[in-house]
Swiss-Prot record:
GO BP: chemotaxis; neuron fate specification; positive regulation of transcription by RNA polymerase II; regulation of transcription by RNA polymerase II; sensory perception of chemical stimulus
Name assigned to this protein: Homeobox protein ceh-36
Region (Disordered): 33-63, 113-156
Function text: Probable transcription factor, acting as a progenitor identity factor regulating the development of lineally-related embryonic cells including glial, excretory and neuronal cells. Mediates chemosensory function of ASE and AWC neurons. In ASE neurons, required to diversify the fate of the ASEL neurons from the ASER neurons. Acts cell-autonomously to establish a neuronal left right asymmetry, possibly promoting asymmetric expression of the helix-loop-helix proteins ngn-1 and hlh-2. In cooperation with the transcription factor sox-2, required for the differentiation of AWC olfactory neurons.
GO CC terms: nucleus
Organism lineage: Eukaryota, Metazoa, Ecdysozoa, Nematoda, Chromadorea
Organism encoding this protein: Caenorhabditis elegans
Amino acid sequence: MTTNFYTAFPTLGYTAYPQFAFAAATTAPSLTSATTSSTTMAPMAPNSESGRRAGRRERTSFNRGQLDQLEKVFRETQYPDVHRREALAKAINLPDGRVQVITVWFKNRRAKDRNNKKMDGVHPGSTSSRSSNGSPHNESKPDTKSLGIHIPGTPEFNAHSAAKYEANSAVLSQLQQQQQQQLQQPKSELEDSKPLADTKYDSTQSLLPQAQAAAYASYATTAPYPYNYNSYFPSNFYYQQYGSNDYTPNITAYSPL
């Protein structure tokens, strides 16, 4: 016989198990507190964005008149005191509490002035400097008169060109006259006018070959005279040249006396 499980073990309330009822009662409020905390933390995101935006400083832009006043004070002193900065803020109509902006402007202006001096030291010819708003100042042009440079179109340039042309024309006419005189002059006069080559004695050249050639020429022109060679050799000095093949040389000439 099968018994029904649900009829054998009926459902029991929390009164039968008091420990489980306490646990259920404690867990329910925690869930509600978590949900409420999540709902309360959600609207804080826009407040943080507004806080970051409020921490940013607003950029101050000066007009031309204000920049002229600042540059004037900067030329007088690069480190104005507090009273001077406050008076300058009132002069350029800055709102109250913006004196710090003038301090920052002077700091940036001093840094820019140092950079300009460094650039002038590296490039001495460049004297261009710019103001705080980026507009260039008037550049000082070099004195061309002291350098002796004449700009085309000026009276100095025209006078210099005319004098140079006259000098070149005078030199050219003088050269043409010399060429004409040389063409008209006869050849004999030209040869006489040429300088004679100087004969120089060369110590390294020997005079012995010249003396030998002269002596040989004089010897060849004179008639030879007979010379008796037999006086130096005895009559029986030579071998017998004719006769039989078997011959004995005559050695009597070599025998001792």
